[in-house]
Amino acid sequence: MNLKDYIATIENYPKEGITFRDISPLMADGNAYSYAVREIVQYATDKKIDMIVGPEARGFIVGCPVAFELGIGFAPVRKPGKLPREVIFADYEKEYGVDTLTMHADAIKPGQRVLIVDDLLATGGTVKATIEMIEKLGGVVAGCAFLVELDELNGREKIGDYDYKVLMHY
């Protein structure tokens, strides 16, 4: 299945000069959505994953069905003020400054093997901050999986030597 058939391209969104890759059509098609989830599940199977971690919001949309299919838990990564219990923080660089992500302080147990799942790898800031928090809690990042990678933004450089899978490259 060619998943790119289910990605909408919107020019100059959210601002002039940006090409936005919208995964909504993929999610709206049951066969394409299931196929994408199964591809990530297959990638995860050999890695003996204990937990899926997904950044808000689209990491939830992709990561939760992967966790469900694997029969394991899911831990959300959110912006500050969105998680109700004790959290840890990690800052990351964005195009116009610094932002912060949080994760529950008890989300990952030491030694747990974690797969980070998100919709898009762009600059890599989000995944780098997520890796930092998982490792701070003693987790082992076994890999990362993305529906889409925007190759020209070089997000792969922020992942370093961690294994990763991408279903579509732009």
UniProtKB/Swiss-Prot annotation:
Compartment annotation: Cytoplasm
Pathway annotation: Purine metabolism; AMP biosynthesis via salvage pathway; AMP from adenine: step 1/1
GO BP annotation list: adenine salvage; AMP salvage; purine ribonucleoside salvage
Gene Ontology molecular-function annotations: adenine binding; adenine phosphoribosyltransferase activity; AMP binding
UniProt cross-references to InterPro entries, sorted A to Z: Ade_phspho_trans, PRibTrfase_dom, PRTase-like, UPRTase/APRTase
Keywords: Cytoplasm, Glycosyltransferase, Purine salvage, Transferase
Pfam families from the UniProt entry: Pribosyltran
Top-level taxon: Bacteria
PROSITE patterns per the UniProt record, alphabetical: PUR_PYR_PR_TRANSFER
EC numbers on record: 2.4.2.7
Major localisation: cytoplasm
Cytoplasm listed as a keyword: yes
GO CC field: cytoplasm
Keyword Metal-binding: no
Reactions that this protein is recorded to catalyse: AMP + diphosphate = 5-phospho-alpha-D-ribose 1-diphosphate + adenine
Chain's role: Catalyzes a salvage reaction resulting in the formation of AMP, that is energically less costly than de novo synthesis.
Oligomer status and interactors: Homodimer.
Protein name as it appears in the record: Adenine phosphoribosyltransferase
Species this protein is from: Streptococcus pneumoniae (strain Taiwan19F-14)
